[in-house]
Amino acid sequence: MISKSIIYQIVSVLAVGLYFVPMLVVLMKKLWSAVPFRLFALYWLICALANLVEYMHLSPRALDLYTVIYNMLDIPIVLTIFSFSSSSPVVKKFTRIVAPALLAISIVNCIIRGFNTDSLEYVLGGELLIVLSVIVWEIILKLQKIKLTGPVKGLLLIYAALFFEYGTFVVIYIFDYFLPGTSTTTDNFLVYYLSSLVALPVAISGFFIKGIKTPPQSAVDRMEHPFSRSIPDYVQI
């Protein structure tokens, strides 16, 4: 019978490997000019590099501090990406205000309560609610479009993957902070990596949607979306 440790090692290696794939697809398909796809690929590349730290022999204190810093940055980074990828001026404004605000709150909270995982209990819970709300918000806005272009479908797949990942984080968060002792750290990480194995193939399929090119903005679009002139929302045929 295969032990849990072996299963964990296999799952973690596969998950970390998948984190590199979106960036490889962006480079192979020359999607660098497609801003949302590039930013999400960069995000998962950062996740891949961040998860490699697990294979380093760090002291428990150093690993705890690293986990705190990672949790402080993760959701603000994702919200910042949404501020560039969304076509809604309201979502753009909201995420551009909330992302730095959450980071500032996390820093102040850690300065007061200490740089340890326990100090992020309530801040992290609030961040998870906000990022899940923004993801659902964006999915609803995309589905309201009369015609779903290929790139919009690609972004919907990415959003669905993110929603699943952060939904799993909520479960881990509840067990970690409110049901201590119910599961081990290894169990939580195993669930985390398993969620990545499910979510990342969905997200990666979004990068393979046909017709991803930076679209020229029509005069009508420029009038209707004056706030989105500087950075293209998404890419289409």
Where are the regions a protein language model picked out?
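Terminal, non-globular segments
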Residues: 1-237
